[in-house]
Amino acid sequence: MTTASIRRGYHVIKTILHFGLDDLIPKHKKPWYFAIVRNSLFWVRNKHKTKSPAERLKLAMQDLGPVYIKLGQMLSTRRDLLDDEWAYQLAMLQDRVPPFDSALAREAIEAELGAPIATYFDDFNDTPLASASISQVHTATLKSNGKAVVLKVLRPNVEQQILADLQLMTQTANLLETLLGDGNRLRPAEVIEDYRTTILGELNLKLEALNAIKLRNNFLGSNSLYVPFVYEEHSYQRLMVMERIYGIPVSDTEALRAQGTNFKLLAERGVELFFTQVFRDNFFHADMHPGNIFISREHPDDPFYIGLDCGIMGTLTEVDKRYLAENFLAFFNRDYHRIAQLYIESGWVSEHTDIIAFEQAVKVVCEPMFNKPLDEISFGHVLLELFRTARHFDIVVQPQLVLLEKTLLYIEGLGRQLYPQLDLWQTAKPFLENWMSEQVGPKAMFNKVKSNAPFWADKLPEFPELIYDNLKLGRKLLGTQQQMLDKYLRYQQKSHKSNYLLITSAVLLICGTILFTQIVTLWPAYTCIGAGILIWAIGWRSRPKNRKF
């Protein structure tokens, strides 16, 4: 353990005590050494006793810096784990940090390019356009075509800082599994592992560039989403160069209203955009918070979204997609038994789950939702409540579904912020029903045959040879099986004969012994015993020697 990690660990412990987070651990769960640590830092007092535990956690994470802020933001989306108050407080965390020195930014960019910035760019602006915990963005003009671009570069030494904090988080999470009364329900170790995967993925800007290119290609010519062009030849692990956009932040409703944006159409397109990404492309933007979404300035009566920051993307298996679509349809049909069946069939909960008990639990949670109009029912909260219910039946956590739930909550919140009258069900239902019709029935079968036709056309010339080889193999197997059967029958015949003789000899020996003790004339006894020994010898010699068939 390095001096820096010891110092960081001390700062984390001090912050926990300063905000009174140690009070959240039940007294009977605190280990013997906890009091020693607490007393050795007697001058650190809880100065926030009047604040709620959730607010104290938010303030502590804000104080601990960017890595913990991003963890808090991720936790705020895990409403299947946290109560609403905790999720609300953590959602207020802001990933805003002071920019780092532009000289360091230049040095990092040139190290990735392998050449001075002026070789490829003009008008590089030392003042960053934006600054976050992991990266910083500068503007410039690309020399090759004169177009405005942005350069996203990772902060210096950010990987080492994140790995050090992740190590501390993992150790703390393992301790909390034991100390917290509901540690198993909150699953801190699982949450940190999920966070590790997410944040380490954000450290690879080359991967983000490839994600952006794929998402852009999926929506080329679309009237709902535009993804800026990425200059792949200038993108590396610590640097990404992309087209500069000039949209309006989706959270700036005043500016959108001032330009006459069609909010109803924009909200509906947001819902369609989500379901298209999930069910058509199986590749969805999983970090669609307001800071990553802009709205076009052109044609406000026919607006489209502009998507940035493709560091976190989600995918679902075909099985997950089908069960998810069926889940939503079953919910709106109030078919709770089918919902319970789907969770078990999909493997999201154990096959040994009591389906009747699970169905009743789902009904208790879902039925009250129908007391309000359909246009007020939230897809995200339906999924959230189902996950929360499944927690009590030991749901097998599916990271891809957690990303989906988070994204769906973002999209719904965004849609209703833009257009409060948005009827999510009426917008999504035709999409889900059309997608389901393509997955089952004659049309689905025809599409699958059609999609596999090139494969079978490629294999068709090999069919005669494959058929001939299989016939030869079949004949060979048949001959081998016949030989094994013959050997087995011979073995059985010998075995039966041997057993018969051995049993007969045993009977004769027993009879001879009885006669030997009961009568005066001994020749019958000797005859039985002699015959028994002879028959035993014959039976013993006739035993089958080999059991291999």
Curated annotation (Swiss-Prot):
GO terms for cellular component: plasma membrane. Coiled coil: none annotated. GO terms for molecular function: ATP binding; protein kinase activity. Pathway: Cofactor biosynthesis; ubiquinone biosynthesis [regulation]. It is a multi-pass membrane protein. The active site is at D287. ATP binds at L129, A130, S131, A132, S133, I134, S135, Q136, V137, K152. Residues 123-501 form the Protein kinase domain. It is an enzyme of class 2 (transferase). The keyword Membrane applies. NCBIfam families: PRK04750.1 (NF003404), UbiB (TIGR01982). Belongs to the ABC1 family. UbiB subfamily. Is probably a protein kinase regulator of UbiI activity which is involved in aerobic coenzyme Q (ubiquinone) biosynthesis. This is Probable protein kinase UbiB. It comes from Shewanella frigidimarina (strain NCIMB 400).
